[in-house]
Amino acid sequence: MSRIAVIGAGAWGTALAIVLGRRGGHAVRLWAYEQEVVASILARRTNDLFLPEASIPATVTVTDSLTDALNGAEIVLSVMPSHHVRRLFTQMLPHLSDDMVFVSATKGVEDQTYLRMTEVIEEVVTPRFSPRLVAVSGPTFAKEVAKGDPTAITAASSDEDLARTVQHEFSDPRFRVYTNRDVVGVELGGALKNVIAIAAGICDGLELGHNSVAALVTRGLAEITRLSLACGGHIETMAGLAGLGDLVLTCTGGLSRNRTVGVELGKGRKLADIIAGMRGMVAEGVLTTNAAIGLANKHGVEMPITQQMHAILHQGKSPSDAIRELMSRPSTTEVWL
């Protein structure tokens, strides 16, 4: 029996705990920061705050103690917001060991440092030991995963055996896991698509039609690909689950928090008011925009959509003005990387 610690009981962390718990053969411990989450799971086997529709199997134990969650764990699954990863791994460090496998399911890039999530974990843990790391990503809505709707993701690691281990431990008939060696592309695809999803939502909020969203998704994929390649990613990954797959889902699906932020911005609402109404949930694209611009500047990569999203989110630019500027850029060839 594999012992798995799931660190983070938001919607996505809870959904993954459900997948692992229903698979059988796992002892799953779900760590939650929020006392309300712990209480509701203990009382009703539901996460009333973040994923109230889903029933959590008895094979999943909930705790608010990191020590208890990590005790004896063979796999540590990190599903916390990107801005908490460094702090929590620093807090967990005394309880971590080199025989653990660390799996990151967080789709984000750290602000200021521009590090991907596995890089953050590696930087924190390496003074003690060299961590064994895997990143998982793909087109996933937590609600559908928890429900058992057919889903496919990618597990990426420079160590193929580690990727296959995660593939084996996470797969079931309703949750298919592929492997990939391109950690850079898988993580950047999962993080950067959130920025493009906000842009797609703005188009819907402004009622600009389907053509505009299709154009944004396509050109958004082009700039994500350019940055990923500049950082060492592989172009093939951008055509896969962690690239195109996740981008299409997040830009068009009604359950996308990042797209929803864009829709509300397009309707004229203020970002602070939108975030305040999200009940503690995180739209990673808002934070990732800063890091994406930093990475683009570092590598000399042109990312016009991302630049306009940064201006809207952090500089108060009008969404209508941003769209107008994107459409009036100098003409160029379509295919260039």
From Swiss-Prot:
Binding residues for sn-glycerol 3-phosphate: 107, 138, 140, 193, 246, 256-258
**Listed transmembrane segments:** none
Q: Does the keyword Metal-binding apply?
A: no
Name the Enzyme Commission number(s) assigned to this protein: 1.1.1.94
Q: Which InterPro entries match?
A: 6-PGluconate_DH-like_C_sf, 6PGD_dom2, G3P_DH_NAD-dep, G3P_DH_NAD-dep_C, G3P_DH_NAD-dep_N, NAD(P)-bd_dom_sf
Leader sequence segment? none
Q: Kindly state which reaction or reactions the protein catalyses.
A: sn-glycerol 3-phosphate + NAD(+) = dihydroxyacetone phosphate + NADH + H(+); sn-glycerol 3-phosphate + NADP(+) = dihydroxyacetone phosphate + NADPH + H(+)
Which molecular-function annotation in GO is an example for this chain? Answer: NAD binding
Which cell locations does it reside in? Cytoplasm
Question: Binding of NADPH: at which residues?
Answer: 12, 107, 142, 257, 282, 284
Its Gene Ontology biological processes?
carbohydrate metabolic process; glycerol-3-phosphate biosynthetic process; glycerol-3-phosphate catabolic process; glycerophospholipid metabolic process; phospholipid biosynthetic process
Q: Write out the GO cellular component annotations.
A: cytosol
Pathway assignment reads: Membrane lipid metabolism; glycerophospholipid metabolism
In the UniProt entry, which residues are flagged as the active site?
193
Entry coiled-coil feature ranges: none
Q: Which UniProt keywords apply?
A: Cytoplasm, Lipid biosynthesis, Lipid metabolism, NAD, NADP, Nucleotide-binding, Oxidoreductase, Phospholipid biosynthesis, Phospholipid metabolism
Relate the protein's function as given in its record.
Catalyzes the reduction of the glycolytic intermediate dihydroxyacetone phosphate (DHAP) to sn-glycerol 3-phosphate (G3P), the key precursor for phospholipid synthesis.
**This protein's name:** Glycerol-3-phosphate dehydrogenase [NAD(P)+]
Q: Which organism is it from?
A: Koribacter versatilis (strain Ellin345)
